[in-house]
Amino acid sequence: YGMVKPSPDCTPSPNSGWLPMPERVDGFAQVHVSGTGGGPKYGNVLVTPFGDGMDRVNHYDYRKYETIRLGYYDTQFKQSGIRTEITTSNRASFYRFTYPEDSLKSLAVDAGFFLGENPVPDAREAQQFVGSEIQVLSDHEVAGYTRIRGGWNNGKAYTVYFYAETDRPFVQSLTWKGNRITEAQSQYDSAEKTGALLRFAKNDKVVQLKVGISFLSMQKAKFNAHSEIPHWSFEKVHQDLLGQWEQLFQKIEIDPSTPLAKKRMFYTGLYHTCLLYTSPSPRDCS
């Protein structure tokens, strides 16, 4: 319930990003919609934990299992053994990555990824890449934007700005433009896809990540991340989100004597009515 809706993004890519196992996972993007019909929309700012070398930009994997609850997602990759847990605030995603002891600890941030890419230029209801930018700001921070057009509404170009911060420092950071990986710490917009590869220390088994999103600026994305999640407690973020859902569910009460099956059906329907809430809110539009 909010502007940020993190999800695994699978191939072939559906509108909501997620597909059942055994489809592969390209990573976890921050902005999604579901139930729209038509061509895919959004699927922006992909983050992917990986455990091998920093010599390629794509690091897809397959799920060993999935656990999905209200406000919480958990999976483990088969090949790398990396566990990913996700929860959110309204405008910021929160991740907890747990790496195997003997694994390299790395993370890719892809500013150019989006759902529904079609090799046919201007294919009906396909999204098309317009531009992207990424900057490594410090040994904890990465920021940038992605600009995409098209999708189910054949819409004009939109820009999603992001700010990503980890609780552990990078010991190495590279960036890419197209498929060219370099030691440069910034890649500016020149109509090619950009991203960053981040390496953590060998003993950093658990790495946490905040990703703030804004449709206005990178500064707003940073503000959203810091104001909504000013700490590093995964459990607190999840509990705060559950509290928000409880407030929504309490808006409509049904007779306590209603059979459990009907209660479940009713509140599931009420939950579904809230899934497409994506308003940036006055704070992000001022």
Labelled PLM ranges:
Residues 1-279, 283-286:
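Accessory carbohydrate-recognition regions in carbohydrate-active enzymes
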